[in-house]
C-alpha cells in the first residue's frame, strides 16, 4: 500500500519525520568478509583475483585473461546496434560539453602587502571506475563517470567490470571506448576495489575509485578509503515530483515508475495539493505497471516505498522538499522557475513538465551520479571537480616576511611551538 501523508492531518509532522527516517535497504554486515578479501588481494595480487573470479563469477581468468582486449571491444562495436551507438555518442558529446564548463580556473594575485597568493588546479593522475555486472551494468553510467574524468585531464582511467559466466555487456565496452577509458579489466566485487587501491601484477593502482556497487563493493570502498579517494557510498535511487493538477497523470505516473523499476528499494514520491489528481496518478501507475518488463521490481518499489504527500498549497511544498533532499526533484507546476531559487537541497532539479528525469539519466548533459538518502543536504553530484585537486600558492619576499613575520612568531610562541617561531625568527635575525 502506497504511503499517503496529508498536511492537514494533526499528526502530519510526526508521520513526516518518521517517513524521512525510514530505511529502504538493510545494511548487510559484510565488513569481516570484505576485509579478508581486500587483505588477500593486497597480499597475493593476481592469484587472489583468479580465485575469487572462479568462485564468484564462474570464470577462469587464466584462460580469458584479466584485461579486456582491443579485439573484444571491436567485437562489441560490431555486436551493438548502430542506433544505440549513435545515441551513446550524442550522450557523450553533451556530457563532455556540459562538464567542460565546470573546469575551474587557476588564480594568483598580489595583496596590499605585496604577498602573492593563489591556487592552481591539477587532475588526479589515475582513477578507477567500478561498473556493476548483471542487470545494473549500464553504459550510461560508464559515460557519466568517465567523461568528467576525461574532461578534467585524468591521464589514466581504469575500468573494472565483473564478467559473470564470462559475459560482458557489449554496450558497456562501447561506452568505455567512447569515453576514453584507458584500461578495462574483467574483475568485480570487493576484489576489484582492492586491486584498484593496492595494485596487482596486472592492474596498476589508482588514486581514486568511483562508481556504484553492491554491499560488498561499498564496504570495500570504505576500507580502502585513505589509501585512495572515493566518490560516495550511494544508496537506492529516488525521485520527488512536485506537480499540480494541470499535468497529465499518465506523464507523472511514467516518471514515478522510471525510478521504481531501478530497484525494489528505489523510492518514488508525488507531492501535490490536489487529492483528485493524486488519485488519478495512482490509477495511472497501476495501469502502467503491468506493461513493464520489470513489473515485479517496480511493483515492489511502489508498494513498499512509494508515497503521496498532499500539501495545502505549493508554498508549503518548498520546505518539505528541502527536508526530503531528494536525489532527483521534478518541479511540474505553473511557475516552476520560481521554485528553483528556493530549493536548497536536491541532487538535481528538473524544471517543467517537459523535463522528465530520464532525460537527465541519459542525454541531458548533467551528471546522473547524485547524492541519495538525503545526503543532498551536504553533498553534490559527480563533477569535473571530483577528479581534480586544488593546491594553494604563497610567495613572500623579504619585505613581506618582515611585515608578517612578527605576528607569526607571536602566535607560534603562544601555541608553545618554538621551532615554528624560530623558522621565521632566524630569517629576520630576531
UniProtKB/Swiss-Prot annotation:
InterPro entries (alphabetical): Ald_DH/histidinol_DH, Histidinol_DH_CS, Histidinol_DH_monofunct, Hstdl_DH
Organism listed in the record: Brucella abortus (strain 2308)
Binding site for Zn(2+): 259, 262, 361, 420
EC number per UniProt: 1.1.1.23
NCBIfam families noted in UniProt: hisD
Residues annotated to bind substrate: 237, 259, 262, 328, 361, 415, 420
Family as reported in the entry's similarity comment: Belongs to the histidinol dehydrogenase family.
GO molecular function (one): histidinol dehydrogenase activity
A GO cellular component entry from the record: cytosol
Cofactor dependency: Zn(2+)
Positions with a binding annotation for NAD(+): 130, 191, 214
Gene Ontology biological process terms in this record: L-histidine biosynthetic process
Keyword Signal: no
Protein name: Histidinol dehydrogenase
UniProt function note: Catalyzes the sequential NAD-dependent oxidations of L-histidinol to L-histidinaldehyde and then to L-histidine.
Annotated active site: 327-328
